[in-house]
A protein has these predicted regions:
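Extended active-site neighborhood of metal-dependent phosphoesterases/phosphodiesterases
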Residues: 1-96, 177-201
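Binuclear metal-dependent phosphoesterase catalytic core
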Residues: 169-224
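His/acidic metal-ligating clusters that form di-metal
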Residues: 67, 83-176
């Protein structure tokens, strides 16, 4: 799923050449989601793409549903808009929000667990500002709507939910509620490890087990 380095950061002043970030997003989607992508993706069980936003997808593995959402850093494309039309950037961010929330709401209720993946660290970049919206596109928290939606989703499904993201440095995990866990995957700025994630039965509970693929040891670092 796209992240800020692939499009939202392409207008930075230290880059040569610099690009309009919205133009880069169109280019990126054309490059990524072609016939070869679909040929491989369609080998996944129950693979689907969101018709209105093809980067949002879902599939199943071992009765766990995997869901991708397009949530990029810079508060999902709302901050540091340096070369694009800001009002158009805000409108597109609002559309992404609506599509993402709709896609999450369509999760298959028969799955035994859910893995939800996106690029932005919506937790570390938390602010005290209100959620971004059509009526408040600036001086707002572009990630609040997702923190709230994911918490509500986990509370509704009553099944294990794992949120996977990147964006910030630490390789860590954090239980957010009884059945909601986040994993900040390794790999920002440098390769450090590969996370192996399993859904395991422990007594009467089904929980996520996250281990290092290199050492086999469990991930004990807690995200702050």
């Amino acid at each position: 799923t796209p992240g800020d380095n692939e499009w939202a950061d392409c207008d930075r002043k230290n880059l040569t050449p610099r690009y309009d970030e919205l133009e880069r997003l169109v280019f990126l989607k054309t490059l990524m989601f072609d016939d070869k992508y679909l040929e491989k993706a369609n080998t996944l069980v129950d693979f689907q793409q969101q018709p209105s936003m093809h980067e949002n997808a879902r599939w199943r593995f071992a009765d766990v549903e995997f869901i991708t959402l397009h949530i990029a850093g810079t508060h999902n494309g709302r901050r540091e808009v340096l070369k694009s039309d800001k009002q158009l950037a805000y409108q597109q961010a609002d559309t992404r929000d609506a599509n993402n929330l709709n896609w999450l709401a369509q999760a298959n209720p028969t799955a035994k667990g859910y893995v939800i993946a996106f690029q932005a660290d919506i937790y570390t970049h938390r602010t005290a500002q209100p959620a971004c919206s059509k009526t408040q596109p600036e001086q707002c928290d572009g990630f609040k709507v997702y923190r709230d939606a994911l918490a509500e989703f986990a509370n509704t499904v009553k099944k294990p939910v794992l949120v996977i993201h990147g964006d910030t440095g630490p390789y860590c995990q954090q239980p957010l509620s009884e059945n909601l866990t986040r994993l900040n995957v390794p790999g920002d700025f440098m390769f450090s490890d590969i996370a192996k994630v399993s859904l395991v039965q422990q007594d009467t509970d089904v929980t996520w087990q996250i281990n290092s693929l290199k050492s086999g040891k469990p991930l004990k670092r807690i995200c702050r």
